[in-house]
Amino acid sequence: MKASSPTSLQALVEALRVLPGVGPKSAQRMAYHLLQHDREGARKLGDALRGAADHIRHCQRCNTFTEQEICETCLDDRRDASVLCVVETPADQVMIEQTLTYRGKYFVLMGRLSPLDGIGPREIHLDRLLARATEPELGGPVGEVIVATNFTSEGEATAHYIGEMLKARGLKVSRLARGVPVGGELEYVDAGTIARAVMDRRNL
């Protein structure tokens, strides 16, 4: 007769499977490692996940992750408020920050257009992006919008849509240079390549 795992262990394995790239076997190995070798680490992990889930929210201005209503980047008067960089995820924002070449503000889409998956303009907050880029009470109108979506087919389609939307409002719109490889995602590109792509950006 096949032995069954305790219910709480099964629940842990299933919970770990929500992580990207983690299949059933990997989740099982993680669960057994935590319980067999690092129970204190497991408790800290649980507390950290619970704390983040309870306290992290979206910035009301740029939509990135923050614990406040407005994030520190949006509140930083030392940054160039005339330039707005549009990225897909907070992880992409971190990658651009690590280049130390960009000192403007951001807007985070939290995704990209993918009609086959039911992700349209509303799901990636393009109405909020338009307001952020144009309305004075939100810091607009900005002098330039840099579209830094990934160079995947969905990212390119998103960049084109955003470019047309903002150019119709008279805004200058640019795109990262092709230093980032086709199909590449910013999260996995080195900082030097991203820095060059930002500096050599082209008009849309």
From Swiss-Prot:
Alphabetical keyword list: DNA damage, DNA recombination, DNA repair, Metal-binding, Zinc, Zinc-finger
NCBIfam families with a match to the protein in the record: recR
Gene field: recR
Top-level lineage group: Bacteria
UniProt name for this protein: Recombination protein RecR
Family of this protein: Belongs to the RecR family.
Function: May play a role in DNA repair. It seems to be involved in an RecBC-independent recombinational process of DNA repair. It may act with RecF and RecO.
One matching Pfam family: RecR_C
Keyword Metal-binding tagged: yes
Transmembrane segments: none
Toprim domain segment(s): 82-181
Gene3D superfamilies, per the entry: 3.40.1360.10, 6.10.250.240, RecR Domain 1
Lineage: Bacteria, Pseudomonadati, Pseudomonadota, Betaproteobacteria, Burkholderiales
GO biological process: DNA recombination; DNA repair
Molecular-function GO term, any one: zinc ion binding
